[in-house]
């Protein structure tokens, strides 16, 4: 199928460790043909916010005519109906690594923690990093992929070996954009835990 799950994250450095995507089972999701010509899956409640902004940008860049609809809804589903649907991972190295593990990865999971307040209503899951991710990982018996060492540096299984995780954010985004896999990278402020003594960013590792 020539379509993309439009997922989001505030921690790009965790994307090489991605093993699943998560939707809210009770929310509505749509398969849409967007003004940029691509077909996406995302939450119905966030269509105007995400795709409307993209259409405005395309008009300013004179890539589409003013008045062009931001999207056309092709199909609508409950999140639960997407459960188990598989997708191609962003990084080939991750795909090869997970293929050697006994657990299946890279499919849609469901959990009520996914909200409609930000993003696309589809959340990236890396069970090695983050409490919600770890809970979903246990619930679905997902592969455990941890491409970060004890010093907080990316490991050799990634193209970012030796980089501190937060320093890997930008290279990850650059590589995804080159591969045509980055929809947007908006800058916004959000809370992130830091050490109270040395003020360095903390990493949640399961």
Regions found by a protein language model. Name each.
Residues 17, 27-29, 35-149, 177:
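Catalytic alpha/beta core of large soluble enzyme barrels
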Residues 1-16, 28-30, 36, 84, ...:
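Residue patterns forming the tRNA-binding/recognition surfaces of aminoacyl-tRNA synthetases
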């Amino acid at each position: 199928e020539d379509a993309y799950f439009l997922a989001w994250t505030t921690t790009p450095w965790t994307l090489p460790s991605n093993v699943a995507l998560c939707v809210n089972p009770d929310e509505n999701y749509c398969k849409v043909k967007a003004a940029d010509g691509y077909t996406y899956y995302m939450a119905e409640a966030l269509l105007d916010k995400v795709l409307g902004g993209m259409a405005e940008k395309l008009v300013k860049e004179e890539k589409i005519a003013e008045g062009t609809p931001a999207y056309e809804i092709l199909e609508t589903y409950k999140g639960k109906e997407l459960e188990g649907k598989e997708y191609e991972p962003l990084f080939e190295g991750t795909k090869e690594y997970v293929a050697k593990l006994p657990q299946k990865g890279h499919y849609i999971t469901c959990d009520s923690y996914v909200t409609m307040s930000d993003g696309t209503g589809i959340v990236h899951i890396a069970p090695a990093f983050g409490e919600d991710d770890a809970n979903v990982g246990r619930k679905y018996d997902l592969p455990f992929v941890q491409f970060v060492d004890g010093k907080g540096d990316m490991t050799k299984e990634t193209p970012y070996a030796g980089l501190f995780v937060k320093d890997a954010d930008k290279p990850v985004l650059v590589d995804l954009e080159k591969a045509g896999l980055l929809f947007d990278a908006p800058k916004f402020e959000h809370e992130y835990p830091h050490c109270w003594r040395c003020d360095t960013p903390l990493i949640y590792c399961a």
